[in-house]
Amino acid sequence: MNTVLGKAMVVLSAFTADDHGVGFAELQRRTGLPKATLHRLLTELVAVRLLDRDDSRYRLGRQLFELGMRASVERGLIEVATPFMEDLYERTHETVHLGVLEDSEVVYVAKIGGHRQASSPSRIGGRMPLHCTAIGKALLAHAPDELRSQVLTGPLPRRTPRTITAPGMLAKQLDAIVEAGVSFEFEEAAVGIVCVAAPVLDASDRPIAAVSATGPITRFRPQAHATQVRAAAAGISATLARRPRTESHTP
């Protein structure tokens, strides 16, 4: 592997489950990398917390553990959500998304759509702002007060002429979303695209994810599908709640 990423993977793969700390010389023996290259990679991997360094010895970092746990959580979430998303797609015949909250953005982790799917800007693994997407607003409405305040006091970038950029207007929408259990987006993230979303909540009403149906404004009426989207989100929430704790959304 001649790429930087490939070489970084060689270094990470050189560690075993039994390693409690590996020295530079042993890592060079295991990887076969030149000293200068290995030193640079180790420095960068420590900087991003993929490796920890204790004196002159290295071990796998906590960030790797956190990434692994996140991947496991998302796989379980997607496994539970998929049947409900497929049913929602059959009912709406429009693009169905599943998104999760990460930092101050929504990350799309699953997407179902047929040949009629809208030309939405979303993609699996892609990120979008919270304030201009139906999924983002559904998540933000149920997010901790600290995050809501952070978003409302920060800049609200305009993506289209219909993007909400006034904090007061967004705050009123978020309160209404909590009451209604559903959020809407009307050409706020992309011109010509409308969306309806509902939050997937845990037993404490904290947001686990949100599910949505998205379509072109020329044929899709979000309000007409609000009940179906809300039912899909409720079904995902209920199914997650019945799963053993080791398989649920929380470690």
Protein language model features and the residues they cover:
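Conserved segment of winged-helix/HTH DNA-binding domains
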Residues: 63-91, 117-120
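Short hydrophobic alpha-helical segments used for membrane anchoring or interfacial signaling
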Residues: 98-103, 112
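N-terminal helix-turn-helix
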Residues: 1-78, 237-242
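Short amphipathic alpha-helical signal-transduction/dimerization elements
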Residues: 16, 136, 140, 144, ...
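Cysteine/selenocysteine-centered motifs that mediate thiol-based redox chemistry or coordinate metal-sulfur cofactors
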Residues: 147-158, 234-251
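Extended hydrophobic
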Residues: 163-239, 251
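Short N-terminal helix-loop-first-beta-strand/juxtamembrane motif that initiates sensory/input modules
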Residues: 91-96, 179-182
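Short, solvent-exposed recognition segments
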Residues: 117-189
